């Protein structure tokens, strides 16, 4: 039951920041009873990778409180998806520049929404997403400060 409690009470369990719980849950989710209970009784799915374990709890209908509190625009969610796609292709401890991420976002998202990094509001939106992802432990700032990007388009940050 501790495993289910951990999955319910944590948005995700990151190996790097919570090794003990990560390995405990990883070991327990291979138990067919727990897996069956989560999938058949609750109708949820366990997402497991070498870095993260997450219980994907999709509600039957959305409620106003269900969004990410830090996000203020729909664009924030679009940028989050692009950032997560970019990070998924990166290996652990692989450093990259903010400018590389921005180029990737432009190619992925430009089909769906307008991307104009000269706009303060769009740069601010990206900064909100980067800070959110960093707070969740999926990204580390190695050198620089992403919040400066909202004010200065030419600023550069090194991430890991």
Model region roles, listed by residue range:
Residues 11, 74-95:
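Positively charged, polyanion-binding regions of nucleic-acid-associated proteins
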Residues 26, 75, 121-125:
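Short amphipathic alpha-helical segments
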Residues 47-61, 75-80, 102-107:
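A short glycine/small-residue-enriched secondary-structure motif
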Residues 86-159:
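Internal, well-ordered domain-core segments that constitute the primary functional module
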